[in-house]
UniProtKB/Swiss-Prot annotation:
Protein name: Ketol-acid reductoisomerase (NADP(+))
Binding of Mg(2+) 1, residues: 217, 221
Active site, renumbered: 132
PROSITE patterns from the UniProt entry: KARI_C, KARI_N
Membrane-traversing stretches: none
GO terms, biological process: isoleucine biosynthetic process; L-valine biosynthetic process
Gene for this chain: ilvC
Organism: Pseudoalteromonas translucida (strain TAC 125)
Length: 490
């Protein structure tokens, strides 16, 4: 199979990259009607598979699960997830031929083998749905001409898909129809109904393309969402230890600090995050972030270039074929980092202290969010899509670090995201070595204190203006307006 994106003419590549339209609430007045009375069969029952299935069933749809024979006979976790929640579970041969819609919610690396196994069993005129377009775009999967191919991609981990639905809300979602596979012209109606069934229509739905979703999703998860948080955790912790700060305190400041800091980001963007700092600290964080952006911009450009031309996917798939040798080695190395092995201390850290003593962390989040957004939009990805794949998801990933450090983050995200995270981390750590030599405890570990409390008014005005005028803040203000019912993470 050939990389689908690379087979397209340039104009078509650009058109699909730029495909992103925010859908109005009145476009979802039909709810799940387009899927009512149809049999939905989900392949796989991990985090996304289980939680999407629960939501779809609670929305009145007919949902069952199909798993590999071995998963059923050995009563693996996927089988227990489905059966203990009262779903019908069967083999591919038992359930796929009866399905009107097959939802492929297995891990990326299994998509080709899964689709090749189920496609001969799918009935004429049925629909194949994905929640990530990697198999179509990067692997170039060719689906039977009579089958409709759609995507519904919630922009958060599966657990949040369920929790927000139970609150009567939902999570922002991207939907798309594969232009090569919409023989009956009902792909969009079915994708909208699927999004409504998961609750996504209550938080905002972007009508996108498989290509735009994949290229932006890969970029966000490799850089700000996972790579920058892992790199920042290691660098900030090691610096505090070098400067004599208690290891337990340093561990707790990092582990829980990302979550607290990005909670402010979630509600009011980069502007609100920096507004949580004192004026002197805000100036310092802004200056540090601008320096970080200058240093890291070439790395962000390289990641985006490698994603666009398929270099990243080709490299990762070579590792798949080598039994994930690099992925597993890098995962083991991460487990041995000093930060990962140092438990959080039994010390109380007030909410504001995370900001006051984590100025560098704030600067890293700002730099990472803005760079990811700027790099994506420069590559032709529309601002709304770039926002969801940078700023919006950062608090959700930070929340996983708060639970069980980098182990939990890398366990929760996909193997695809984890592989890209390690690539970024390995390149960024040495890139920031000289920068970190200049860092002291005033910006990570202890705070500025009272010895530096003077701020030039003109400088502060310029910084505040620059923060509020950044394009990620402008599009973010609009999109957050659709998410006013968001729950607090902390």
């Amino acid at each position: 199979m050939a990389n689908y994106f690379n087979t397209l003419p340039l104009r078509e590549q650009l058109a699909q990259l730029a495909q992103c339209e925010f859908m109005n609430a009145d476009e979802f007045t039909d709810g799940v009607d387009a899927l009512k009375g149809k049999k939905l069969v989900i392949v796989g029952c991990g985090a996304q598979g289980l939680n999407q299935g629960l939501n779809l069933r609670d929305s009145g749809l007919d949902v069952s699960y199909t798993l590999r024979d071995s998963a059923i006979s050995e009563r693996r976790q996927s089988f227990l997830n489905a059966s203990e929640n009262g779903f019908t579970v069967g083999t591919y041969q038992e359930l796929i031929p009866t399905a009107d819609v097959v939802l492929n919610l297995t891990p990326d690396k299994q998509h080709t083998s899964v689709v090749n196994a189920i496609m001969p069993l799918m009935k004429q005129g049925s629909t194949l749905a994905y929640s990530h377009g990697f198999n179509i775009v990067e692997e170039g999967m060719q689906v039977r001409d009579d089958i409709t191919v759609i995507m519904v991609a919630p922009k958060c981990p599966g657990s949040e898909v369920r929790e927000e639905y139970k609150r009567g809300f939902g999570v922002p979602t991207l939907i798309a129809v594969h232009p090569e596979n919409d023989p009956q012209g009902h792909g969009l109606a079915q994708a909208k109904a699927y999004a409504a069934g998961t609750g996504g229509h209550r938080a905002g739905v972007l009508k996108s393309s498989f290509i735009a979703e994949v290229k932006s999703d890969l970029m966000g998860e490799q850089t700000i969402l996972c790579g920058m948080l892992q790199t920042g955790s290691i660098l900030c912790f090691d610096k505090m230890i070098e400067k004599g700060i208690d290891a337990g305190y340093a561990s707790k400041l990092i582990q829980y600090g990302w979550e607290v800091i990005t909670e402010a980001l979630k509600y009011g963007g980069v502007t609100n995050m920096l507004d949580r700092l004192s004026n002197p600290a805000k100036v310092k964080a802004f200056e540090l972030s601008e320096e970080l952006k200058q240093i890291m911009r070439p790395l962000y450009n390289k990641h985006q270039d490698d994603i666009i031309d398929g270099t990243f996917s080709r490299t990762m798939m070579e590792d798949w074929n080598n039994d994930d040798a690099n992925l597993l080695k890098w995962r083991a190395e991460t487990a041995e980092t000093h930060f990962e092995k140092t438990p959080a201390g039994n010390v109380e850290i007030a909410e504001q202290e995370f900001f006051d003593n984590g100025i560098l962390m704030v600067a890293m989040v700002k730099a990472g969010v803005e760079l990811a957004f700027e790099t994506m939009t420069a590559a032709g990805i529309i601002a709304e899509s770039a926002y969801y794949e940078s700023l919006h998801e950062t608090p959700l990933i930070a929340n996983t670090i708060a639970r069980k450090k980098l182990f939990e983050m890398n366990r929760t995200i996909s193997d695809t995201a984890e592989y890209g995270c390690y690539l970024y981390n390995h390149a960024c750590l040495p890139l920031l070595q000289d920068f970190m030599q200049k860092i002291d405890t005033d910006v990570i570990g202890k705070g500025l204190g009272e010895h530096s409390n003077q701020v030039d008014n003109q400088t502060l005005i310029q910084i505040n203006t620059a923060l509020r005028e950044h394009p990620v803040e402008k599009v973010g203000a609009t999109l957050r307006g659709y998410m006013s019912a968001m729950k607090k993470i902390v």
